[in-house]
Swiss-Prot record:
Record region (Disordered): 1217-1242, 1254-1273
Family classification: Belongs to the CLU family.
UniProt cross-references to PROSITE patterns, sorted A to Z: CLU (PS51823)
Role this protein plays: mRNA-binding protein involved in proper cytoplasmic distribution of mitochondria.
This protein's name: Clustered mitochondria protein homolog
Quaternary context: May associate with the eukaryotic translation initiation factor 3 (eIF-3) complex.
Biased composition annotated in UniProt, kind: Basic residues: 1262-1273
Organism: Vanderwaltozyma polyspora (strain ATCC 22028 / DSM 70294 / BCRC 21397 / CBS 2163 / NBRC 10782 / NRRL Y-8283 / UCD 57-17) (Kluyveromyces polysporus)
Cystine pairs: none
Cell compartments where the protein resides: Cytoplasm
Record-annotated Clu domain positions: 344-599
Gene Ontology terms for molecular function: mRNA binding
CC per GO annotation: cytoplasm
Length: 1273
């Protein structure tokens, strides 16, 4: 299609929608004209462009943010002929393919209680009451603040011409030098930031407190308060007069207004704080008609002179930020950091409890809503997007409600349905809650409660996979898991009818004659799978057909018989026909196969004392899929055909039911240990996978590869074995090189003697011919002709590599993750039976035992409430030695890996590495304050304070106190994401090499759909922006790549945290992109943030993590790019110091850096310092590479060349001095100029030419080489 044709089609598919505004809502017109983002005409109309398939709801959504209409909440859109339904599309309304214009108008509706509350809530959001750190569960945990928004970035530079690289030879030791086109101001700013980074290492001043300090309150309220009045509810007498609610408003200036809400709007009444009079207040200059405002904003602006200016100031403030830095999340929660900058200000605000719109709506039935949305037809893309958007919203709303309900249970505020039972269940707002435990003995012999905990995770994991399958006849339940204080609650929507009260029968006992009331059996019961009541496995052909076609097929399950009944999933799962006639499947934990080899080795055949805590050791779905794909690929079968023919299926009941086996399950179990685990180790060692920043990063990689966390110990052992093997190979290679060096030295001595002999013999021949008066033949005057076979040419053999920078941090991070997960289980053990108020005391006590023993050797549990005596609880008997032994025991049982007895002590100078890992795993938030792990630290802190403060300071009894920390819920949910978006993205990926523009369009559509479905604040959106930045970078569109990556960072900071691996990974990408975009200052700012975050935990020193090394390497390249050699030398020296601290000064990395520093000094004519550094390299290169290696030979040439050059300079200096003592002034001047000439010539040379000069031994030879190189270029 031609470009014109495309444009025409686009024009036809787009419709101009004009919305006429009612005259009564026009307010603060001057403000509108300044701020209006859309075209507001004098006729009070708004105009937009929409695709034809757009639904009316989308127009309503746009109007809810347009400046002229955003304060309107209760209206309908209409044409001349009809009031529009939100589900209608523009195409259905116009009903004319040729028409591309639609005129609409707004019809205001009378208010009722629900709409008044919605209006007030909306207004509060727009005038600053919706703080950027609040989400649906802010009452239980504190959300992350922002740091990224405060980085003082320069604007993204537009694309410039390609940078020409300075010519260079193949010497790998020479720094790469790309000259960056930047201003002197940026060079200075860059240098300042780099020195700041250097100082943080030199003086060890990377401070945890400042590194984790964040800003909050980007959004600030424009009123002091906006609440329901204490005079509510409306008295009966006034209710019949139309009064709906009473409001109380206090402005920032202290003005107080009491407001009456009526169907037509709002007006100021005559009430005061102690007097009730809801009648309209007379205000001078305002007529009665003007006193009632349909819009509450207009009413406040009318009566408060400064309110409007406060709103303008807020809007101006927010305009300086990206919206993603302050908007509220729609389908996810904000990150809950382990270290909170400060306690949030708890300003008096009744509305937090008053204005909950749910109180004014009918009780929700999440299951009915969810299933109805799933059944919506989606014939068009727009309808698919709408369906996914609704599914995502309701999933998150369910999770929010579930968390609130679960926390009520944890705090003892919800009554159980069966208060006398140990297995208590709860029901509120059509959400069913139950404690996760083995109450009915289902896991007897399999691990009991531990197995039940594992099964709940596996059940949820299966549901997370089902959400992406478009199943029509099989239904599943919304599910959320909430962990808090050692207990776990499973929240689900109940199967319709399953919990319904069917009434009761009165029966007479045959023996006693007593009458008893017995509940009638529910008509809704298990019809397929395990019926727990009868203990039988039931068959149902219709149910089985649906399950096998829509569920089992995609999960590679094999249909099989159990007790004569044919089923297509695990016999422990259940199929229930709900009262809504839908087929529900529940209890899906055992969908995936047992890790049979692990179970047999560590549970079935293990001693009881060494047995793994449970047998619910299933393989992950990622592993099954990885194994299945490997089988399909090996067989050369087409994917769809393999699905249709049910290739490589497995029986989920194998090794779960006695006598049932499956060779494919055995193969999967072997595949995990023998193929996947070693390949992951190899990927880490070779750098194919990034070194993990922390345990979460590591586990994310393991899960992607289908590896369970129970293999963390195995991973650490394999990594240690790999490292040890490399070290052994390295040592063996060094011995071989040592022998080879001796051999070479012997050959060299012999060869030199041979040449010497040849020279002597030839000279004797020449002398004889001369004496005889004969002509000397040409062959005796030419260079000696040597036998090429006798010459040993320099080698370029690769060194024996030891991947210390990859494997050592992998081992350390794995051990820390084992420790953190071990502590999670130990804390769960001691907290599960505690009242909530005693939990902080237990946690503080355990942390003091582990980390505060140097401050207080014998800490005591802190009392929290007189009703709860902490000394009576089990945890109070703990000792440090006992706790360390328990850690070793639990780590050995759960991870098959025993941590060293001094493991915690290894981090005594960097305890927050371990504290952070415990906090993130167990749901603990600490205040960001000074903590003292020794008495000396407290004394130093005391001395640093002002004298007035110093005298009032009282030393804390322990390192940690109850007031320092908070327990927060840990949540696992479905997290509904867009399948359509993923499909668009996959299409774009396939097209990228064929049609770049089409691919980028598909990527843009995919992200737009993701944002529509999940909202802009979501991990999936951030990940897509990060990937898109990489795509644009590879296509040379660097400015766009930088913009996308910045957006990814801003999102990740809010939903994952400032120190999360996702954030650090995004920052690393951003730093490189800023460098590629010739913005060294911006790049340095990002590297500073990375280094500051990581070094505040001392991970370079304690974990051997290469992130700081990588940062210095990139900063060095940038400093060369801005032609600041001295700064480059400083960076190289710091880089070298880090390498020495980690690996010593006898490594190839050290020698390479010394050589690089020497080159840099030589380039600025500082030959003395150049010689000092370069002279250290031959010995190391000789030892590591061999005497006859190219690099070793080159380093010797450097040393000899520099030595000769320095001697030559000294001789010339001496000659100049001698001449100066006997010559006149003019002669003296000429001599000095001659003496300085070589140095001046060298100053003009690049590092590359300098090497040629030193190797050649004369400036003439250097010039010839340089000319030759330029000619080749």
């Amino acid at each position: 299609m031609s470009e014109t044709g495309k444009n025409s089609t686009a024009e036809l598919s787009a419709v101009k929608v004009t919305v006429k505004l009612p005259e009564s809502i026009v307010h603060h017109r001057s403000h509108q004209k300044k701020q209006q983002s859309h075209n507001v005409k004098e006729t009070n109309e708004l105009s937009f462009q929409f695709p034809r398939e757009t639904r009316v709801q989308t127009i309503l959504d746009v109007l809810s943010y347009a400046q002229a209409t955003k304060y309107l909440t209760n209206f309908k859109l209409k044409t001349v002929h009809q009031i529009l339904n939100p589900e209608q599309s523009i195409n259905e309304i116009i009903n004319d393919e040729k028409s591309n214009h639609l005129n609409l108008s707004i019809e205001l509706c009378p208010y009722n209680t629900r709409e008044i509350v919605r209006h007030v809530l909306t207004l509060r959001d727009f005038i600053g009451f919706a703080l950027e750190t609040e989400d649906g569960i802010s009452e239980f945990s504190i959300s992350t603040g922002s740091k990224f928004s405060n980085i003082p970035f320069m604007d993204v530079k537009e694309k410039q011409e390609e940078i020409e690289e300075i010519p260079r030879d193949d010497n790998k030791n020479l720094p790469k030098k790309n000259v960056l086109k930047v201003s002197q101001e940026e060079k200075d700013n860059f240098s300042k930031e780099v020195h700041s980074i250097l100082d943080s290492f030199k003086y060890s001043n990377s401070n945890l407190k400042s590194a984790y300090s964040t800003i909050s309150n980007i959004v600030t309220p424009c009123l002091n308060s906006l609440n329901l009045s204490a005079f509510n509810p409306v008295p009966a007498f006034f209710k019949t007069k139309g009064h709906i609610l009473y409001l109380h408003i206090v402005t920032l200036e202290g003005e107080s207004f009491h407001v009456t809400a009526v169907p037509s709007g709002f007006y100021i009444n005559k009430s005061s704080s102690n007097k009730f009079d809801p009648s309209m207040k007379d205000v001078e200059g305002i007529t009665q008609q003007d006193s009632i405002k349909y819009n509450l904003y207009d009413l406040i602006a009318l009566h408060s002179k400064k309110f409007h200016s406060h709103v303008e100031a807020l809007e101006k403030k927010l305009a300086a930020y990206q919206s993603i830095e302050y908007v509220k999340p729609l389908t996810t929660f904000l990150h809950k950091p382990w270290l909170v900058s400060s306690l949030p200000a708890n300003n008096a605000d009744y509305s937090r409890m008053q204005l909950d719109s749910s109180q004014y709506e009918s009780e929700r039935n999440f299951n009915d809503e969810f299933q109805a949305i799933r059944e919506l037809p989606t014939p068009t893309v727009q309808e698919s997007i709408q369906s996914e958007r609704l599914l995502s919203r309701i999933s998150h709303e369910f999770t929010t409600a579930a968390v609130k309900g679960a926390m009520s249970i944890f705090y003892g505020e919800m009554l159980p349905l069966n208060p006398e039972s140990d297995d208590q269940i709860f029901l509120r707002d059509n959400i069913f809650y139950s404690y996760v435990m083995d109450a009915n003995g289902s896991y007897d012999g399999k691990g009991g409660n531990d197995a039940a905990f594992a099964a709940s995770n596996q059940d949820l994991k299966t549901i997370q996979i089902l959400k992406n399958l478009k199943m029509k006849d099989v239904y599943y339940l919304l599910t959320t898991i909430i962990d808090f204080g050692g207990k776990r609650i499973l929240a689900q929507t109940p199967v319709p009818g399953l919990l319904s009260n069917m009434g009761a029968d009165v029966i007479t006992d045959a023996d006693s004659g007593e009458q008893m009331i017995v509940d009638k059996k529910s008509e809704v019961s298990v019809v397929y799978g395990l019926d727990e009541e009868s203990g039988k496995v039931l068959a149902n052909d219709q149910f089985d057909k649906s399950v096998s076609e829509e569920f089992s097929k995609y999960l590679h399950l094999k249909s099989h018989d159990v007790e004569g009944s044919k089923i297509s999933f695990s016999y422990q799962s259940k199929g229930i026909l709900g009262s809504d006639k839908r087929n529900y499947i529940i209890d899906l934990a055992n969908t995936y196969p047992l890790d049979v080899k692990f179970a047999k080795e560590h549970f079935d055949n293990a001693e009881e004392s060494k047995r793994y805590p449970h047998r619910q050791t299933l393989l992950r779905p990622e592993l099954v899929e990885k194994w299945w794909n490997s089988k399909v690929q090996a067989e050369g079968i087409e994917i769809n055909k393999a699905y249709d023919e049910a290739k490589f299926t497995y029986n989920p009941d194998a090794y779960q039911v006695e006598g049932v086996e499956d060779v494919n399950i055995q193969d999967m179990s072997s595949y995990l240990v023998e193929t996947v685990l070693p390949s992951v180790i190899e990927d880490y060692a070779t750098g194919n996978v990034s070194v993990p920043y922390d345990g979460e990063h590591l586990v994310d990689t393991l899960h992607i590869n289908g590896i369970n966390v129970r293999y963390l110990g195995k991973l650490a052992i394999l990594a240690k074995e790999k490292l040890q093997l490399q070290e052994e190979v390295h040592e063996k290679r060094l011995k071989e090189i040592e022998i080879s060096n001796k051999d070479y030295e012997e050959w060299e001595a012999s060869y030199l003697k041979k040449i010497e002999k040849m020279i002597i013999e030839r000279q004797e021949k020449v002398n004889k011919l001369v004496q005889e008066g004969k002509e000397v033949p040409k062959e005796l005057t030419e260079e000696l002709k040597l036998n090429e076979d006798d010459i040993r040419k320099p080698t370029d053999d690769a060194p024996a590599v030891v991947n210390t920078d990859e494997l050592l941090p992998l081992i350390k991070v794995t051990e820390i993750e084992i420790f953190a997960r071990t502590m999670k289980h130990i804390l769960r053990k001691y907290t599960k039976d505690l009242p909530v108020v005693a939990i902080p005391s237990m946690i503080a006590f355990v942390l003091n035992l582990l980390f505060g023993q140097k401050y207080n050797e014998v800490p005591k549990p802190e009392s929290v409430d007189s009703f709860y005596d902490v000394d009576t609880y089990e945890f109070s008997k703990l000792t440090r030695d006992g706790l360390i032994k328990e850690i070793q025991l639990v780590s050995e049982l759960r991870f098959r890996y025993e941590l060293a007895a001094d493991f915690v002590d290894q981090f005594s100078d960097a305890p927050f590495i371990l504290i952070r890992s415990i906090a993130r795993k167990s749901g603990i938030q600490f205040l960001n304050k000074d903590y003292f792990f020794t008495k000396d630290q407290f004394e130093e802190f005391k001395l640093s304070q002002d004298k007035k403060v110093r005298g009032k300071l009282v030393a804390p009894a322990n390192t940690f106190t109850v007031s320092d920390l908070n327990m927060i819920p840990r949540i696992k949910d479905i997290d509904y994401s867009s399948v359509l978006s993923d499909q668009k993205w996959a299409e774009g990926s396939m097209l990228l090499n064929e049609d770049q523009n089409a691919a980028l369009t598909l990527f843009a559509q995919a992200i737009a759909i993701k944002e529509e479905v999940n909202g802009v604040l979501h991990k999936d959106v951030a990940e897509k922006y990060l990937t898109l930045s990489t795509v644009y970078s590879k296509l040379g569109l660097t400015p766009e790549a930088v913009a996308f990556c910045r957006k990814s960072c801003a999102i990740y900071e809010r939903v994952s945290g400032i120190d999360s691996f996702e954030m650090l990974r995004s920052l690393s990408n951003l730093a490189l992109l800023e460098f590629a975009n010739e913005s060294p200052y911006n790049s340095a700012l990002v590297f500073k943030r990375i280094v500051e975050t990581l070094e505040s935990l001392k991970i370079t020193e304690k974990i051997h993590h290469p992130a700081a090394l990588n940062a210095f390497n990139q900063l060095e390249q940038m400093s060369l790019g801005v032609e600041n050699t001295k700064l480059t030398v400083e960076l190289c020296k710091q880089f070298r110091s880090l390498i020495v601290s980690l690996d010593g000064n006898d490594t190839l990395a050290y020698a390479t850096l010394e050589s690089r520093i020497g080159n840099l000094y030589a380039s600025i004519n500082d030959f003395h310092n150049a010689m000092e550094h370069i002279s250290k390299t031959p010995r190391i290169f000789t030892r590591e590479l061999g005497t006859n290696h190219q690099i070793t030979a080159q380093s010797r040439q450097w040393v000899n060349g520099l030595s000769n050059l320095m001697k030559d300079a000294q001789q010339k200096k001496k000659l100049a001095a001698e001449q100066a003592s006997v010559n006149s002034g003019s002669r003296k001047k000429n001599v000095n100029q001659k003496a300085d000439a070589p140095k001046a010539e060298l100053a003009e040379k690049s590092v590359d030419e300098l090497l040629d000069f030193i190797e050649g031994g004369s400036t003439e030879k250097s010039k010839k080489k340089s000319s030759k190189k330029k000619g080749k270029k």
